[in-house]
A protein has these predicted regions:
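Short sequence motifs at beta-strands and strand-loop junctions characteristic
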Residues: 103-106, 115, 128-130, 183-185, ...
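Outer-membrane beta-barrel translocator domains and adjoining extracellular loop/strand segments
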Residues: 85-92, 137, 160-165, 204-208, ...
Length: 407
């Protein structure tokens, strides 16, 4: 499995892994002994003590309890779908309108993986069983806060390509014009954090990582913040036709930041059971898109200006040919020779969008028994963007099922 993660992220992950591996040593070191401690072990012991105290600070023990065993490991399965939809509009010289819509998705995919953590601090890794890509996640949850970090990657060679052509008399749609010779690669980074105003009686961790156990029903107002960054690349030379139809754009990067307030409730219908629901409307105060444009070279000659000078005429002829039922040979000229196009990066245009709204919705069902627990939960997010080149949105939903064991 290949997950393209930056060097900084790799070091961050390695540091978290090292810290988690050192915690058992710190626990052993804290059990006794008067000799001089190794500075690394001493530092890990300090972190362990801090985590232990933060996990239960200020909680009402009649509502929330802490498991005796601090470590937890779980096997996870995940059903998910991420959909990225991009539009590019073309007002033609004839007065007609053309729209290119690219919808790429990882499909209804299933991931399998594992997670390990200590008192609500842990990381997990999942692999897509039906295709490329996977998910790397890290979480930190205390008595009154929760932080989630996730990197997700996938690629698709079979996006839904829709070319729409409108005139005064009719509308013409051509779906799935062709599969791509090179896949569209999508990578997303997701970071969110929450603060619970009723952390004394309500536990977010009890619903989403089981480092605490909710004993009685309780709810809480919440404040939250979210950061989302995603990129889509389809700039391979084999995709030159798609890049041309997207107005020369072969790579997009989206960055969004939101803040919000909402409410969450933990319902305890019977001993060991917990049902959680959370809804948080969010104000999107930062929303930018960077569009990377490309130049088209043929045998070393820059043909970009010639292509786009005659763009309207060429596109109109293609659309009229499709609407008349003409056969599109695609990838060859009239002589039958292959068309060799090389894409070279030209420039980048960054647009800052208007303030908008999105929401974060989550639902979880948990059952605890002895040192075991079973959890099923899901969430949904939508992110929008627009610029002078086009507009679109990203939809993401996930449903997880986890079987965990405390030790």
């Amino acid at each position: 499995m290949y997950i393209p993660i930056s060097i900084t992220t790799k070091r961050y992950r390695a540091g978290i892994l090292l810290l988690l591996l050192l915690l058992p040593l710190a626990a052993q070191a804290g059990g006794g002994g008067t000799g001089k401690q190794n500075p690394v072990v001493k530092g890990a012991l300090w972190v362990k003590t801090l985590i232990d105290s933060m996990a239960v600070k200020g909680i009402d023990r009649s509502y929330i309890s802490q498991p005796k065993r601090p470590w937890a490991a779980e096997l996870r399965t995940e059903a998910s779908e991420t959909v990225l939809k991009m539009h590019a509009d073309f007002p033609l010289n004839s007065g007609n309108q053309a729209t290119m819509t690219v919808t790429t998705r990882n499909g209804f995919s299933t991931l399998a993986g594992a997670w390990v953590g200590y008192r609500g601090y842990g990381f997990g890794l999942s692999k897509n069983l039906s295709g490329n890509g996977g998910t790397l996640s890290f979480g930190a949850m205390g008595g009154s806060f929760g932080i989630n970090f996730r990197i997700n990657t996938y690629s698709s060679s079979t996006p839904d390509l829709r070319l729409s052509y409108s005139s005064r008399d009719y509308n013409f749609d051509e779906h799935n014009i062709e599969d791509l010779d090179a896949p569209i690669s999508v990578r997303s980074l997701f970071l969110d954090g929450y603060y619970m105003f009723n952390g004394k009686r309500f536990s977010y961790a009890a619903a989403y990582d089981q480092s605490l156990i909710q004993r009685r029903s309780a709810g809480s107002l919440m404040a939250g913040a979210m950061y989302y960054h995603s990129s889509a690349k389809y700039d391979d030379d084999a995709n030159y036709a798609l890049v041309a139809m997207m107005k020369g754009v072969g790579k997009l990067k989206f960055t969004q930041a939101s803040i919000g307030a909402g409410y969450a409730y933990n319902w305890v219908p019977a001993r060991g059971w917990l049902v959680n629901a959370m809804l948080m409307p969010m104000l999107q105060f930062y929303n930018s898109i960077s569009a990377y444009t490309y130049r088209f070279y043929s045998d070393g000659f820059d043909a970009t200006d010639i292509l786009f000078t005659n763009y309207d005429r060429i596109l109109e002829e293609v659309l009229n040919g499709l609407s008349d039922g003409a056969d599109d040979s695609g990838g060859a000229d009239d002589s039958g020779d292959e068309v060799n196009i090389e894409l070279r990066e030209g420039g980048v245009e960054t647009t800052h969008n208007y303030i908008g709204f999105n929401f974060d919705a989550r639902l979880a069902v948990v059952y605890n028994w002895s040192d075991w627990y079973l959890r099923v939960y899901g969430h949904y997010n939508r992110f929008r963007y627009s610029n002078d080149i086009g507009y679109g949105h990203t939809d993401e939903w996930r449903v997880y099922a986890s079987l965990g064991f405390r030790f």
